[in-house]
Amino acid sequence: WVVAAGALVLYLATLHSWISFASLPAVSHVGGCQDLPQTKQPLLYLFTLPLKLLPASALPFAMNGLAAVFGALTLALLVRSVALLPHDRTKEQRQREQSEHSLLSIGLNWMPPLFAALICGLQLSFWQHSTSGTGEILNLLLFAYVIRCLLEYRLDDKPSWLIRATVVFAISIPNNWGMIGFLPLFGVALLWTGRMRLFREGLWLKLLFTGIAGLSLYLLLPLVAVMTGSGYSFTEVLTDNLGDQKSFLSNLFSNR
């Protein structure tokens, strides 16, 4: 939390003063300046829903401030995740590190998390999205939380960590097409982390149902469009988001 507080102060001090080119689409949707209904990033829509109550002049600053909070929380999760990394991958590590769960126990064990936070937090793209309300930093925050949950499960074997990871990953997919590409890796990570316990205790059913529930976020913006009388049908709004995600993924793999 010390790192998160320091990062928040830094990002607030260097906050974008107004609307950037990258944040224009998100800010215009929140401010109601778009003629078309919002069809993408349903999770960002939920987080920014209270900001619609603000006057238009305060909206850009509020969006940028929210991005700074997301950026600071992402670094806090990064610090925790690095601290949880096991140090028993090689024979030499197993000989030197005798602590429980093979966590780094030397006097300078605070340096790797701090170094990771500095490298990530001061990286130009990360800094830009943490000081401008583009909405991209929310995607990274969710990704960081999923990794943290998988690492926490290794310590206490509580199934709730795997359930949290599944829920957050599932709600990330409608908001970010990139998470679809990570889905096979996430499945492998769940199997590797949970091992046979997933099948002995019926945990896989809980993960399946919570994942499906998270994916229902795809339906949020189509419902909003219909309820607000935007003139667009439920199917049109839904297929616009799904079509864009399919297009991004197709272009990604076709260019390799």
Name each model-derived stretch:
Residues W1-L10, L73-A76, S102-L114, L205-A213:
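Start-transfer (signal-anchor) and selected internal transmembrane alpha helices
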Residues A22, S125-L138:
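Short acidic/glycine- and proline-prone juxtamembrane loop motifs at membrane-interface regions
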Residues G31-F61, G65-V69, A76, S172:
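Short hydrophobic/aromatic helix or loop-helix immediately within or flanking a transmembrane segment
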Residues G107, F143-L162, I171, L190-M196:
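Membrane-interface transmembrane helices that cradle and orient dolichyl/undecaprenyl
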Residues W1-A22, C120-L122, G211-G229:
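Transmembrane signal-anchor helices characteristic of membrane glycosylation enzymes that use polyprenol
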Residues E136, I180, A189-R256:
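Transmembrane-lumen/periplasm boundary regions of multi-pass, lipid-linked membrane glycan transferases
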Residues G65-S102, A117, L142-E152:
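Transmembrane-helix motifs of polytopic, lipid-linked glycan transferases
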Residues A117, W161-N175:
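Membrane-interface alpha helices of multi-pass inner-membrane proteins
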